[in-house]
């Protein structure tokens, strides 16, 4: 079996539950490691009132003892503090106040209508509660564990916002030397950006959207430093690392496009200005001077930083709602309004880190499989020696 995880829970239910399977034994994981990542997700200028209620903290139920993974399934819970206000609406038994929060005017752009048609639900709350981005808190908790696994092999994950609405911002070209600096800067920024000069413009765009009852999307970059060559494969479509990464990024609510490296810009350029040339020197071995490919060629990691961009549409809940249809009365009305963020791009970047960490961790374990961290480390050390001996690969 391969590394996998599953989540469950509703936005206003008792909490979110997750299970991580096939995590090798011996990975150092603590609740505080996970809580730090959960706190990063909750930050961001443009978040809604829910973040004033929730203070996400994980409770690990199984799979970890004395601070280390056991190799058994890791189960965990994140309680929803807001459930106190929804107990009689989201009860698993009789919902005494069920009628108060019925949703039958689907929001354009949300799962409301399509989900209700698929699952034959007249009350679309039964759809939106699970489709809500609240679920991503459970993903970030799992992602914290995948990051701890990768960090055991000096593989680091990062993210940075690329745009908020129409405001495009500068990003860093990230490497082993500046990774920590970038992490500190984006975590200090309410927009998760290194471009302090453009921060007022981003804030202004969000404030204007709020005043108009609008929402804003944007884009972010995620990357992994220290990925060895050889993860993923060209042998079959599902084994290509780039296809796995894009699928995982687009599983994040509201993400409507993803690219590996400079994929979109590269489509308009001649090949001579796109492909990353290969160089060799006695000191540096095989190396590249550019990384427009995003660290993946032929579906396989090539030893450069693996990086991607994801593009987020504006959140579907608008405080000046669009036209919809009341599916009980069958007449046009304005869509329902749910408490929501104005802009969640900074938070989505943290979720993107988790999804990318999962993709790389899964591919890493497929390549260097083992039941314990020590067993995997032996396999990886042997592979590193092979790369250096046969392929003059010095980035070890």
Swiss-Prot record:
GO terms for cellular component: cytosol. It is an enzyme of class 4 (lyase). NADP(+) binds at residues 41, 47. It comes from the Bacteria. FMN binds at residues 130-132, 298, 313-317, 339. Gene3D superfamilies: Chorismate synthase AroC. It catalyses: 5-O-(1-carboxyvinyl)-3-phosphoshikimate = chorismate + phosphate. It holds the Pfam family Chorismate_synt. Pathway: Metabolic intermediate biosynthesis; chorismate biosynthesis; chorismate from D-erythrose 4-phosphate and phosphoenolpyruvate: step 7/7. One of its GO terms (molecular function) is FMN binding. Keywords: Amino-acid biosynthesis, Aromatic amino acid biosynthesis, FAD, Flavoprotein, FMN, Lyase, NADP. Its EC number is 4.2.3.5. Disulfide bonds: none annotated. Its cofactor is FMNH2. GO terms for biological process: amino acid biosynthetic process; aromatic amino acid family biosynthetic process; chorismate biosynthetic process. Reduced FMN (FMNH(2)). This reaction introduces a second double bond into the aromatic ring system. Belongs to the chorismate synthase family. Homotetramer. This is Chorismate synthase.
